Amino acid sequence: MPWIQLKIDTDNQHADTLSDLLMEEGSLSITLEDGKDTPIFEPTLGETPLWNHTVLTALFEADRDLSIVVDNLKLQPFLGADFSYKIEQVEDKDWEREWMDNFHPIKFGERLWICPSWREIPDPEAVNIILDPGLAFGTGTHPTTALCLEWLDSLNFDNKEVIDFGCGSGILAVAALKLGATKVTGIDIDYQAIDASKANAERNGVEDQLTLYLPEDQPENLKADILVANILAGPLRELAPLIAEKVKPGGQLALSGLLQEQALEVAEFYTQWFDMDEPAHKEEWSRLTGIRK
């Protein structure tokens, strides 16, 4: 069944009101997108931010007369008669198949591959992780996850224990175990992340070596030879003492989730405990690494 969609340029002040009006006009779904590729980082608790320039897309059944919808919208004072819009036909597709076709195996470093379950493994002799896109946690496609995976691929994990601080999907924890770590502890504030990490560890046959905790449940004096934290600049600054105390002397640290302009400032929070390396960059993102003093 074909569809028709109405695209409207709006702003963060009127996006919600416009969404409600379009639903009243019979829209089947509303999508809000950034109109100018403006990133949003670290919203405050309970905040659902929108972009200053927002593109709203309303999907309708193909037989809906959108000229009537547009005429009704022109009566709204915040839009007026000359508001910008576009009407497009939407071809009916097998959306699930189209979505799956967008994901392919990705190589990180010299040994490590992340492979969707429906794809053939490119190199059976490599270190392969089976991971499907799902919850809004890392799958390797984001530059910060890629930076962490490349760093993990470069390490020697013989007799090493690892902490994945902010484990999300568990991709970094599973990678460390597949690369040879003896044990990984994953910590996350989100119980859905704990469930996702557990499921991905089971899928990859490393669940017996992975222990998962919410922060309030983690053991006292938990320490590891290697700690990786792919979270955000704010928590990395705030939690620097806690993160530092979890790394054994001589242990290795990697921090990501940072924009390039945040990297050096965040690194300063760790220099009293770590000998920090120069940041590594991918696109606008950075990774910090260091050795515990």
Swiss-Prot record:
- List keywords of the entry alphabetically: Cytoplasm, Methyltransferase, S-adenosyl-L-methionine, Transferase
GO MF term list: protein-lysine N-methyltransferase activity
Give a Pfam family name.
Answer: PrmA
Identify which top EC class this enzyme belongs to. Answer: transferase
The question of whether Transcription is a record keyword is answered with no
- Family membership noted in the UniProt record: Belongs to the methyltransferase superfamily. PrmA family.
Give the residues the record marks as binding S-adenosyl-L-methionine: T145, G166, D188, N230
Protein role: Methylates ribosomal protein L11.
Catalytic activity, reaction form? L-lysyl-[protein] + 3 S-adenosyl-L-methionine = N(6),N(6),N(6)-trimethyl-L-lysyl-[protein] + 3 S-adenosyl-L-homocysteine + 3 H(+)
Q: Which GO terms describe its cellular component?
A: cytosol
Q: What protein name applies here?
A: Ribosomal protein L11 methyltransferase
Can you tell which superkingdom this protein's organism belongs to? Bacteria
**Enzyme nomenclature, EC number:** 2.1.1.-
Where is it localised? Cytoplasm
Task: For this entry, list what GO says about its biological process.
Answer: methylation
Main localization category:
cytoplasm
